[in-house]
A protein has these predicted regions:
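Histidine-dependent nucleotide/RNA phosphoesterase domain, centered on the 2H-phosphoesterase fold
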Residues: 2-237
Length: 237
């Protein structure tokens, strides 16, 4: 086959595809689209839901909940972020997340238990082995920058969008590979910084109106140089 004929056939092959492979969305684009859909959904509802983490099931657990996360330094945020928190706190169904616990969860591992009785429980021995595997797999990851904001909200919690060029999703893919029984989830992984939980079902009121000025605002930039294993006690709210 001659070169010209090869080119013609290649062009015809490409034109048959409505969306060539290089048009496929990348991870950052997919994340941005997910954030837009979440915000759009918020504008279509008129009530918030109970999104507390400290449910009766949580408080009845005997062992700590273990997560892998990136902590967000307090100095990351510009003054407007603290103004946003004050605005959120005017709603009686809002419980702000303590600033010293701000983090981006990459993988939830489960509750510690000497005798696991479900897919969401793990033994201390399993945790040690899991972390050893992760150390090997993550050794080639390099530090990366993260921009936080603007504000967004599920029906049960307010959060900040995360712009990380897709790195948290890549970390999640590595970490979830070693989970013996990956958690059942309804939605794909999406990085987020939860800043408030809604503590009961209630009319939304002016929430969307109050958050709109902060929707496209960037609240800060920080560099992820490590991820942490955090144990959350289940004997306290």
């Amino acid at each position: 086959i001659g070169f010209r004929e090869f080119v013609k056939k290649s062009v015809r092959w490409l034109l048959r595809w409505r969306h060539p492979f290089w048009w496929l969305p990348d991870v950052p684009s997919e994340q941005d689209e997910s954030y837009r859909r979440i915000w759009s959904h918020l504008r279509q509802i008129d009530r918030v839901a109970d999104g507390r983490h400290d449910t009766e099931d949580f408080l009845n657990r005997r062992g700590d909940l273990v997560i892998i996360c990136a902590r967000v330094p307090a100095e990351t945020f510009i003054p407007e972020f603290h103004t946003l928190l004050k605005v959120l706190d005017t709603h009686d169904y809002v419980r702000l997340v303590p600033p010293d616990t701000h983090n981006i969860t990459v993988q939830e591992l489960g509750y510690l238990s000497e005798r696991p009785n479900g897919r969401d429980e793990i033994t201390p021995q399993w945790l040690d082995e899991y972390l050893e595997q992760c150390l090997i797999s993550l050794k080639d990851f390099r530090p990366f920058d993260v921009r936080v904001g603007g504000v967004n909200s599920y029906a049960d919690a307010a959060f900040l969008d995360i712009h990380d060029n897709g790195w948290f999703s890549r970390l999640h893919e590595v970490l979830v590979d070693f989970v013996s029984q990956p958690p059942r989830t309804r939605y794909p992984f999406l990085p987020e910084l939860i800043i408030a939980q809604y503590i009961h079902n209630a009319p939304m009121g002016t929430l969307v109106h109050d958050l709109t000025p902060y929707r496209d605002m960037e609240f800060g930039l920080f560099r992820v140089e490590q991820i942490d294993v955090v144990r959350i006690p289940t004997d306290e709210a």
